[in-house]
């Protein structure tokens, strides 16, 4: 991670601007690996009816097959890139109206992906081979999550020193907010793990139509709309208020309300019409705080 910034002062206006970049290629996550797939025997037995109720039934091997079992372990395959600009400006206090103004905000871009192979298959029937097929191995980084946003926060603070009263109003605007996913080759594997011996083999894409590898073909199970990047959400406003009363020089009581107008608009996806997202859904809350100084 690295960042560079500048502080400035023009008259009573003070501020700072910072640009940063942050990246990692070995972040923590839990994931399956080639070593966490195990080929085991899958035995089915039939039971003969005992001669009497006190005897145990006699078991005989009915069938024996090979299947794959898997589990996940802690790994360092999480990767991301992040960059952005942050700013904070204090416009100072206008004494004639006993009010100060401040503005801060940020622009951010974020991308994350798994820096390792992914493992996927699907069942093709009720038989052992259909229920426990080979495991498809897909190329690293074939799915990446993206997000970006541009936000500003205007803070207005008005105080009346004579009665120890302070009102702070904050207007937060998300000018741009976007989340979408990009995909690489997530339909035909580049390798596979055999259910018969647990070994990893390179996969010849020309064999994807063979019955043995039907469970590795994801083309018919993926929605083509996933390849269309989602558009940005429109701007949204959230207003917060805080009222503080100072009682003498040892007590302070505050009342606050976040998203005071309960603005929670609904946004409809352009890629998946009929899919709605309620914005600002968890930002409305209010309360009171009491602080006492003990000297």
Q: What is the meaning of each model-derived region?
A:
Residues 4-10, 85-91, 152-158, 171, ...:
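Residues on the lipid-exposed face of transmembrane beta-strands in outer-membrane beta-barrel proteins
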């Amino acid at each position: 991670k690295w960042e560079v910034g500048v502080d400035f002062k023009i008259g009573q206006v003070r501020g700072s601007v910072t640009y940063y970049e942050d990246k990692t290629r070995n972040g923590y996550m839990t994931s399956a690996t080639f070593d966490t797939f195990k080929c085991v025997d899958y035995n089915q037995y039939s039971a003969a009816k005992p001669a009497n109720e006190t005897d145990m039934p006699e078991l005989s091997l009915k069938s024996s097959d090979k299947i794959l079992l898997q589990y996940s372990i802690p790994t360092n395959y999480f990767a991301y890139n992040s960059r952005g600009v942050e700013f904070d400006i204090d416009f100072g206090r206008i004494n004639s109206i006993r009010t100060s103004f401040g503005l801060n905000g940020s622009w951010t871009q974020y991308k994350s992906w798994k820096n390792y192979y992914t493992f996927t298959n699907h069942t093709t029937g009720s038989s052992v081979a259909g229920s426990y097929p080979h495991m498809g191995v897909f190329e690293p980084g074939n799915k990446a999550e993206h997000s970006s946003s541009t936000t500003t926060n205007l803070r207005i603070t008005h105080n009346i020193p004579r009665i120890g009263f302070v009102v702070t109003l904050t207007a937060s605007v998300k000018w741009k907010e976007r989340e979408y996913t990009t995909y690489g080759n997530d339909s035909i594997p580049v390798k596979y793990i055999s259910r018969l011996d647990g070994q990893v083999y390179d996969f010849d894409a020309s064999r994807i139509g063979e019955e043995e590898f039907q469970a590795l073909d994801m083309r018919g199970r993926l929605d083509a709309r996933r390849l269309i990047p989602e558009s940005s959400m429109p701007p949204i406003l959230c207003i917060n208020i805080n009222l503080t009363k100072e009682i003498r020089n040892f007590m302070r009581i505050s009342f606050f309300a976040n998203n005071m107008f309960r603005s929670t608009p609904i946004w409809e996806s352009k890629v998946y019409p009929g899919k709605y997202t309620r914005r600002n859904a968890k930002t409305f809350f209010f309360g009171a705080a009491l602080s006492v100084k003990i000297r």
